[in-house]
A protein has these predicted regions:
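Conserved catalytic core of sirtuin-type NAD+-dependent deacylases
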Residues: 1-234
């Protein structure tokens, strides 16, 4: 029977593709105030500024390719059931060939209505659509006439895919965490839902507090650490 692996990824897995991290020294939040460009308050205060920020992110992503870590994770699907749970809003896992990716914080290549289409549906997936790498501007309207906004979970908003992610971790035989400092909640608590018999591997070059004796820390960058993990599976 194929092993089921839940792969939780953060900004570190895309850093080697040239996409900046957020919280590290020199990261995006050193240049931009997240409360201005990535919070629900910032959106209502100055939506044009938020749209410009994500237009810039989309343009950069258009020129960015997945790295070996993304590709090795996708390759694991040949022998294992792989559930990728990513904190990243890029599409590099999909570009690499991963077929089951849960985006906890949304996707930069997608948009949805600013206002709910109705009280029951909220931002139902049927109202979310892919704009690829195109720009979105003030005045671009959704089908219900409201302003289009990035399909991003802003600071100050709930994480709607969290329950889905928890369910995937609970079913996993192995949990692999790549490129996240486990500082961003609620995602940082996901590994705690792993089964008692499920080993947990963390790939991160920085020191990581180990809260569980099942955790093995592979202290390497994503490409090198995922390669080591894959070798251990063989």
């Amino acid at each position: 029977m194929k092993k089921r692996i839940a792969v939780l990824t953060g900004a570190g897995v895309s850093a080697e593709s040239g996409l900046g991290t957020y919280r590290d020294n020199g990261g995006l939040w050193d240049s931009y105030d997240p409360m201005e460009v990535a919070s629900i308050q910032g959106w209502y205060r100055d939506p044009g500024k938020v749209l410009d920020f994500y237009n810039m992110q989309r343009a950069k992503l258009a020129l960015t390719k997945p790295n070996a870590a993304h590709c090795m994770i996708a390759e694991l699907e040949k022998d294992c059931i792989i559930d990728v749970i990513t904190q990243n809003v890029d599409n590099l896992h999909e570009k690499a060939g991963s077929t089951h990716v849960v985006h906890l914080h949304g996707e930069v290549t997608k948009v949805r209505p600013q206002n709910s289409c109705n009280e029951e549906d909220g931002f139902s997936e049927k109202y979310v659509f892919d704009v690829g790498y195109e720009e979105v501007h003030l005045g671009d309207k959704a089908v219900n006439g409201s302003q289009l906004r990035p399909h991003i979970v802003f600071f100050g908003e709930a994480v709607p895919k969290m329950e889905t992610a928890i369910g995937l971790v609970e079913k996993a035989d192995i949990v692999l965490i790549v490129g996240t400092s486990l500082q961003v909640y609620p995602a940082a608590s996901l590994y705690r839902y792993a089964r008692p018999d499920a080993p947990i591997y963390i790939v991160d070059p920085a020191e990581v507090p180990l809260f569980d004796n099942r955790i093995r820390h592979i202290r390497k960058v994503a490409t090198e650490g995922v390669e080591e993990f894959v070798a251990m599976l063989k």
